[in-house]
Structures are given as C-alpha cells and as structure tokens.
Amino acid sequence: MPELPEVETVRRGLAPAMEGAVIARAEVNRPDLRWPFPDRMAERLTGQRVERLRRRSKYILADLSGGETLLIHLGMSGRMTVSGDPLGQFVHDHPAAQKHDHVVFHMDNGARITFNDPRRFGAMDLMATATADEHKLLMVLGPEPLGNDFHEDYLVAALKGRNTPVKSALLDQGIVAGLGNIYVCEALFRAGVSPRRKAGQIAAARVSALVPIIRQVLSEAIEAGGSSLKDFRQADGELGYFQHSFDVYGREGEPCRRAGCDGTVQRITQSGRSSFYCAQCQR
C-alpha cells in the first residue's frame, strides 16, 4: 500500500494539472471501489474548480470551488496518472483506456487524470470542505510526521506507558499519520531501536531522537519519488527510486549496512506484517 511519501509524490505530480483547473467532465465507470462512490459523484464533480490539492496521511484531498472536498485513497494498487499536453507541462499523450480505469477527470486545461485500480481497494468520497476534518477516515488521525505538531515532547508522551512493540505503535495512525511498514523499518534502523522493544520502555532521549530521523527518512523518500515495489507509479508513470536506498526493508539475510556491524538483516512477523531489522545493532 502506498505510504506517505508515495501519496505525497502523487499529489505533487497531480498539482500542476489540477490546481486552478476545472473538471470539465468526470467519468465514473463503476459504482464502487472498496466502498460505494457517493451519490451523483460525476455530476457533483463536473464544473468544479480544484482550488487546492493537499494530503492528509495517506489520503489526497481536492478542495473544490463548490464547497466540497474530494477524498482519494489509492488503496493497494491504485494509480493516478496525468496525460495530455495543454501548455507544454505534461509529457504524455492520452493513452488508450485500460481495463481498470475506474474514474477519469477531464480537465479544462487539456489534462486527463486517470484513476486505475486493478484490486479495487482504493476509495473516493465527497464531503463538505468546512467539516472535512470530521470525516470518519480523517477524524481518527494523529499529527502529520512532517508537520509542527509532531515533535519530541509529543512522541514521548504518546508512547509513554504503551506495552505494544514500538513498531506497532508507530504504525498506529492515531499516534502519527501516514507512516507505513517500509518507513518505520527504515527509521528504526537508523535510530538503532529494535522493532520488538516495548514502546513504553524506550528512554525518552531515544524516543526524541526518532522524530528527526522519521522526518529525514520521509523527506529523502519524497525526494526520490517514493518506493516502487509492485504497483506504485508516480503521476507521470515513472517509478519511484527510494527502494534502492533501503537499509533493511526487504533485505532479509543480507549484511547489515551500519558501519562496524557484522550482523545480518532478519525478518520477523509483527501483527501480520514483516519487520526487517538487525538484531545485533538495533536494541
């Protein structure tokens, strides 16, 4: 599933084509994805100007001129790609329609935005912009890890007394929004913290050190266009490249990359997910 860096990469790729442009026509080719689409979605989107394209956790939010916000979740295999060349901004001609092109936005600037999702775990919804934060998928989210509300004192307080492994705690979207398996594994490696360690038993200084490390890992991943392991593509169809910088994720049995450590990367299962770490230098 795309994590924060992948969703932010897609948002940045869509913004030049969508922000300030009008949805001249919305094409909805099925009644649902993971959940049913909102009533009259195509009609409600047609003629709306995209005032702002933003991200909250793993969701893309398009604030529309009519006072509604379109929520988009990529799910497991969803892709949003831009085609067309209205002002020399977009490098691809419109491709032929594909089997799993479920929603298409035809913008008044000539761009076309296609949502393709073979596994159909993605989602779209419409809500009033004024109360968007109260949407059931958004109201439960913790602070953004790249935002000002995610700081050392906050994380120390959030993890205090928790008996769950720190890996599971950091994946809790109510504690911090947008973190996923890949980037938690990578951040814990850089911090030298074992994913098995109980969150509430980690010294405050080590918890505090996690905050800038998490920010750094996410920022590097965004700069690299995210990580492409199976399905993820950027908005222009290109792969992400951060997978080439993984220290532990997907490297089971390979040598630890930390200078001076002769350990090997191990894989364990936590809450049904694979955790990758070096037991020798992550304590």
Swiss-Prot record:
SUPFAM superfamilies: Glucocorticoid receptor-like (DNA-binding domain) (SSF57716), N-terminal domain of MutM-like DNA repair proteins (SSF81624), S13-like H2TH domain (SSF46946). The active site is at P2, E3, K58, R273. The keyword Lyase applies. It catalyses: Hydrolysis of DNA containing ring-opened 7-methylguanine residues, releasing 2,6-diamino-4-hydroxy-5-(N-methyl)formamidopyrimidine; 2'-deoxyribonucleotide-(2'-deoxyribose 5'-phosphate)-2'-deoxyribonucleotide-DNA = a 3'-end 2'-deoxyribonucleotide-(2,3-dehydro-2,3-deoxyribose 5'-phosphate)-DNA + a 5'-end 5'-phospho-2'-deoxyribonucleoside-DNA + H(+). GO terms for biological process: base-excision repair. Pfam families: Fapy_DNA_glyco, H2TH, zf-FPG_IleRS. DNA binds at H100, R119, R162. The keyword Hydrolase applies. Its cofactor is Zn(2+). GO terms for molecular function: 8-oxo-7,8-dihydroguanine DNA N-glycosylase activity; class I DNA-(apurinic or apyrimidinic site) endonuclease activity; damaged DNA binding; zinc ion binding. NCBIfam families: fpg, PRK01103.1. Involved in base excision repair of DNA damaged by oxidation or by mutagenic agents. Acts as a DNA glycosylase that recognizes and removes damaged bases. Has a preference for oxidized purines, such as 7,8-dihydro-8-oxoguanine (8-oxoG). Has AP (apurinic/apyrimidinic) lyase activity and introduces nicks in the DNA strand. Cleaves the DNA backbone by beta-delta elimination to generate a single-strand break at the site of the removed base with both 3'- and 5'-phosphates. Belongs to the FPG family. This is Formamidopyrimidine-DNA glycosylase.
